[in-house]
């Protein structure tokens, strides 16, 4: 039996109502707070939302089988910031709770839980500023978030909650890292395989080494070097985004379009550092192709497709002479999607960071060099050094979109493989090292950027596709090949095939598919993150720790601040905070060849590590033997082709969160999941079967003449002006619309709304504001509408003056109420299942208004009980309370949800608007099953229609069944 704070006339009334005109038993904020607190305690005490697993500690104690009809609902978990929640944060959480509660009521076994993404830079920055340890601050923030979220009455299985900073959680993050580290991608099988199988192939001779080397004759170090080249996790001297102001490197996705850090807005520079990388590029095809089987917003799929960026083309080799004394020949590998234009390539451009640049730089300028090509340098080397310094702070986007074309001639030439002609080699910032090969063949006649560059530097422009006027601009359309030797007269597709065949036969090129996607930079020079399960020997060679050595716990250190540099110091070098923990760093270990000294890796994993697999831990959060039992993953996430079709990849049934994670978390988690799938650890090919992106709640903010924000709640609207009552009198302020935030002084805490109206009111208001996917403006003044709706529902059941239940038993419903009820049941059921909570709310309000008008005294139980049931997913606390007061003894959390009777979904009569020459002139009501001839007769004999016709006979009578009748005269 559940307990109620208000049941019966003896329930506790509002404490401040003794001398008030407010009825003693009205639904008020104070009453809402009491019943919400009580029902939340009841749910927690009874384990109402605890959901069973097939096996393990959360399996049914009696060994009973779990229901087959399961549903896994997941939110993108929050980062527990120090500012706490504002009213925009719960939008998606409320929506998924309504969804989960509805399906729980109709009998499905629903898993819904919420954890915290607690590692990362913000906590570390705050700790450095305040002197508070990141763990202390993070744990306090989690407590506050749990309190705030708890007030909203979410039906989460609290046993499954965790933080990514929990040692029991990040132990398995480290374990998954080791699985990826100890795997390689077999391009023949198109999947990851254990490194042990690669070693076995080398040992047996099934796989040969490059250069004909004998595996058996390699030293242990040489074998390790070979294997490291195959691993899915590897170290490389990579071109990285170095942010001196943060003291760490950043992934491409963490750098803004204007070349600054998305956290802190510091300058970011490109430089080479030895870093851990994950070979996500091996999965580019699968990541791209499997988007087709996902039920995701097309916008997100398009963003991932563009980020992966598959291009079909060819590689051509341009030979050149190195500038060293021996002048050895090097091949410059160029990727192009237009091999048909190779005869029009009149110069090459390398990215300034390209590996071959320094080898190809001439000692001096050739005689007669065009001054435009020299960048004002006395030698090519001086010019290139100056140019590199000038572009160091530019973002990739700036480099590609800059209208001014800049570059430097290397003083050397390459040979065009199509015609044997020498072409000058330049570097320019519009070519990126991270795309293709980092080198392009420039065809100014048919590429506008190349045309602009050629015009700026006085380079030749050759037409090889007929159809344009290349003296005015590049021609990028279709046409016939010209000035291209054996390709002349061919179409573009035919020329592509012919030139690729010629390049392949000459050993100077081949067809190839390229991707924009780059390998994932997987190391940060920070403290607050997961330590790597890696140690280094005295030679600096990395060694993975055994799984038995996990977890590698993050040490508590007195100095956890990163070494920060002048934000503009591009030449600075990272120094991780963990390097200061010398006792932790230096360890003696036996890794199979005796006790030896090792040093731990002092980098930490990026913030995305924990979120790359956390959905799996929800399925089995207490398992100490595996990250999750296979049976539990298969039950909650395994493919269900009978339900979702033959191509079902499996995964979480519904995942809700922001679209801003499209090419970060969502791409990384897909990569990790696919590796785990390949290695046999999971049965699902994808982590998230269905994705929904919620919109944002936005609000007005106000700035004074200096651009400083003022508290939005104190701003007064006067006509078309806004004023702020400052300490020196009123000042005019200016309105802007956008994000909610503490710094914008327009933040509203959910605590404020819960205190003023109750949590159910907040839930109803946020769900009624519009479609889930759409952004919407917050208006505190409008919250009262949801509050009054719940008060009307309360009055249908409870007498506000006596506290008695006021429903009428044994009263049959009239036909209008029956139709209204069953239409509402159908509509609300469909809306809840489709996440259309705004229209579900509107239908519930409409039905409530019908009952309020129809039944001034007692409402029939048969009419109001279904309303309470339908309200339960949306406003669960008041629904539970009313359900109890209606005489029920069990919680509504597991149903029942009312079912519609189809007999009441059909109208007995239909009203037809009658148009005369397209304008409505009357209306007739006929039986729903009236045939067309009878309908026409009823229209023509209607008094209003006859009066308008004034004796005229219509030339034509047009009937649109169920909608209208049109008379043409």
From Swiss-Prot:
Primary localization class, coarse: cytoplasm
A GO BP entry: leucyl-tRNA aminoacylation
Positions bound to ATP: 742
Gene Ontology terms, MF aspect: aminoacyl-tRNA deacylase activity; ATP binding; leucine-tRNA ligase activity
Motif ('KMSKS' region): 739-743
InterPro entries given in the database record: aa-tRNA-synth_I_CS, Leu-tRNA-ligase, Leu_tRNA-synth_edit, M/V/L/I-tRNA-synth_anticd-bd, Methionyl/Leucyl_tRNA_Synth, Rossmann-like_a/b/a_fold, tRNAsynth_Ia_anticodon-bd, Val/Leu/Ile-tRNA-synth_edit
Enzyme Commission number(s): 6.1.1.4
TM spans (from-to): none
Highest taxon of the lineage: Bacteria
Gene Ontology cellular component terms for the protein in this record: cytosol; peptidoglycan-based cell wall; plasma membrane
Keywords for this protein: Acetylation, Aminoacyl-tRNA synthetase, ATP-binding, Cytoplasm, Ligase, Nucleotide-binding, Protein biosynthesis
Annotated motif 'HIGH' region, positions: 78-89
Root EC class: ligase
N-acetylthreonine carried by residues: 2
Localisation: Cytoplasm
Catalytic activity: tRNA(Leu) + L-leucine + ATP = L-leucyl-tRNA(Leu) + AMP + diphosphate
Annotated Pfam families: Anticodon_1, tRNA-synt_1_2, tRNA-synt_1g
PANTHER family reported in the protein's UniProt record: LEUCINE--TRNA LIGASE, MITOCHONDRIAL (PTHR43740:SF2), LEUCYL-TRNA SYNTHETASE (PTHR43740)
Family: Belongs to the class-I aminoacyl-tRNA synthetase family.
Family matches, as HAMAP family: Leu_tRNA_synth_B
Cited NCBIfam families: leuS_bact (TIGR00396)
Stated name of the protein: Leucine--tRNA ligase
């Amino acid at each position: 039996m559940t307990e109620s704070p208000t049941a019966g006339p003896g329930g506790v009334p509002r404490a401040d109502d003794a001398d008030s005109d407010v009825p003693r038993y009205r639904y008020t904020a104070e009453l809402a707070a009491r019943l919400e607190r009580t029902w939340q305690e009841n749910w927690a005490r009874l384990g109402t939302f605890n959901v069973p697993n097939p096996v393990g500690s959360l399996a049914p104690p009696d060994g009973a089988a779990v229901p087959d009809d399961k549903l896994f609902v997941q939110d993108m978990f929050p980062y527990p910031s120090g500012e706490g929640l504002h009213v925009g944060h719960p939008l998606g959480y409320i929506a998924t709770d309504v969804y989960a509660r509805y399906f729980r009521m109709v009998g499905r076994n629903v898993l819904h839980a919420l954890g915290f993404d607690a590692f990362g830079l913000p906590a570390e920055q705050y700790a450095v500023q305040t002197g508070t340890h990141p763990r202390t601050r993070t744990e306090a923030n989690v407590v506050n978030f749990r309190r705030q979220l708890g007030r909203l009455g979410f039906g989460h299985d609290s046993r499954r909650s965790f933080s990514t900073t929990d040692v029991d959680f990040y132990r398995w993050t480290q374990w998954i890292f080791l699985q990826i580290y100890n795997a390689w991608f077999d391009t023949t099988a198109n999947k990851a395989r254990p490194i042990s199988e690669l070693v076995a192939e080398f040992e047996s001779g099934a796989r040969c080494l490059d250069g004909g080397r004998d595996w058996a004759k390699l030293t242990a170090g040489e074998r390790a070097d070979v294997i490291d080249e195959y691993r899915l996790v590897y170290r490389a001297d990579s071109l990285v985004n170095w942010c001196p102001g943060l003291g760490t490197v950043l992934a491409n996705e963490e750098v803004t379009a204007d070349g600054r850090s998305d956290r802190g807005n510091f300058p970011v520079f490109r430089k080479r550092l030895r870093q851990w990388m994950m070979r996500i590029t091996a999965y580019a095809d699968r990541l791209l192709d499997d988007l087709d089987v996902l039920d995701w917003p097309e916008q997100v799929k398009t963003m991932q497709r563009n980020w992966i960026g598959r291009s079909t083309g060819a590689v051509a080799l341009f030979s050149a002479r190195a500038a060293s004394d021996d002048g050895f020949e090097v091949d410059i590998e160029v990727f192009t999607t237009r091999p048909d234009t190779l005869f029009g390539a009149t110069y090459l451009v390398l990215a300034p960071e390209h590996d071959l640049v320094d080898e190809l730089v001439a000692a001096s300028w050739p005689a007669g060099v065009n001054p435009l090509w020299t960048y004002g340098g006395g030698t090519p080397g001086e010019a290139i050094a100056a140019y590199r310094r000038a572009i160091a702070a530019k973002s990739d986007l700036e480099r590609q979109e800059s209208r001014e074309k800049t570059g430097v001639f290397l003083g050397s030439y390459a040979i065009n493989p199509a015609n044997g002609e020498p072409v000058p080699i330049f570097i320019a910032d519009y070519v990126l090292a991270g795309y293709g090969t980092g080198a392009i063949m420039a065809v100014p006649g048919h590429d506008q950027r190349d045309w602009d560059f050629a015009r700026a530097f006085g380079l030749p422009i050759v037409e090889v596709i007929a159809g344009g006027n290349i003296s005015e601009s590049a021609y990028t359309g279709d046409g016939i090949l010209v000035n291209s030797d054996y390709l002349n007269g061919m179409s573009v597709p035919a020329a592509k095939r012919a030139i690729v065949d010629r390049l392949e036969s000459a050993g100077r090129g081949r067809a190839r598919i390229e991707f924009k996607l780059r390998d994932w930079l997987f190391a940060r020079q920070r403290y607050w993150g997961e330590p790597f399960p890696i140690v280094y020997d005295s030679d600096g060679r990395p060694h993975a720790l055994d799984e038995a050595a996990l977890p590698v716990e993050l040490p508590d250190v007195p100095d956890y601040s990163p070494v920060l540099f002048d934000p503009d110091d591009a030449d600075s070098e990272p120094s991780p905070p963990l390097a200061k923990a010398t006792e932790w760093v230096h360890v003696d270990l036996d890794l199979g060849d005796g006790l030896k000294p090792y040093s731990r890796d002092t980098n930490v994993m990026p913030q995305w590590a924990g979120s790359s697999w956390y959905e799996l831990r929800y399925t089995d959060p207490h398992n100490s033997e595996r990250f999750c039992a296979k049976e539990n993953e298969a039950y909650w996430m395994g493919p269900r082709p009978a339900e979702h079709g033959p191509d079902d990849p499996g995964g979480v049934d519904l995942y809700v969160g922001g679209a801003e994670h499209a090419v970060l978390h969502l791409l990384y988690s897909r990569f990790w999941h696919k590796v785990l799938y390949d290695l046999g650890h999971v049965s699902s090919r994808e982590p998230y079967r269905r994705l929904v992106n919620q919109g944002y709640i936005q609000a007005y903010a106000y700035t004074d003449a200096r651009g400083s924000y003022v508290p939005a709640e104190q701003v007064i609207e006067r006509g078309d002006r806004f004023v702020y009552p400052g300490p020196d009198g009123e000042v005019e302020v200016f309105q802007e619309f956008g994000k909610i935030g503490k710094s914008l002084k327009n933040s509203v805490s959910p605590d404020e709304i819960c205190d003023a109206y109750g949590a159910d009111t907040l839930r109803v208001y946020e769900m009624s504001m519009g479609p889930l996917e759409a952004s919407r403006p917050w208006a505190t003044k409008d919250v009262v509408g949801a509050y009054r709706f719940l008060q009307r529902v309360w009055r249908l059941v409870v007498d506000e003056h006596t506290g008695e239940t006021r429903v009428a038993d044994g009263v049959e419903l009239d036909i209008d109420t029956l139709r209204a009820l069953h239409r509402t049941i159908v509509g609300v059921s469909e809306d809840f299942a489709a996440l259309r909570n705004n229209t579900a709310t509107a239908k519930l309000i409409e039905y409530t208004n019908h009952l309020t008008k129809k039944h001034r005294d007692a409402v029939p139980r048969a009419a109001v009980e279904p309303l309470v049931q339908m309200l339960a997913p949306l406003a669960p606390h008041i629904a539970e309370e009313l359900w109890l007061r209606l005489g029920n003894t069990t919680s509504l959390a597991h149903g029942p949800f009312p079912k519609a009777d189809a007999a009441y979904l059909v109208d007995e009569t239909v009203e037809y608007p009658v148009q005369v020459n397209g304008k409505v002139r009357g209306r007739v009501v006929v039986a729903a099953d009236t045939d067309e001839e009878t309908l026409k007769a009823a229209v023509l004999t209607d008094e209003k229609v006859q009066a308008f016709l004034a004796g005229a006979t219509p030339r034509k009578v047009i009937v649109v069944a169920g909608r209208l009748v049109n008379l043409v005269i």
